[in-house]
Amino acid sequence: LTPFLKQASLYISKNFNIRFDPEISSKDLSTRIFLATSGYQAYVMQLIHQSCLNTMNNNRLVVSMSDFHAAYASKNILYKPMTQKNIFQLNPSQITEILI
């Protein structure tokens, strides 16, 4: 998933001048994206797309964790989550517990 996320980030940065903080391919965010989508690329792209739209609608150029939370919580995107918890609001230790 990480190489896919790196390419998506490069494409979005180059074509839309939008970046991610934390970086989308970081261990933390990529793990959350995987847990939210089970790694299905179509679902990953829907999540990224909606997160970027949230950012642009708020006149910002940096996609934050809160944008992913809003996109995930909107429930208008198809997912196959690995947990029923909102993965983008959990702290890192809670993420680790889900992975165990």
What is the predicted role of each segment?
Residues 2-100:
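C-terminal alpha-helical "lid" subdomain
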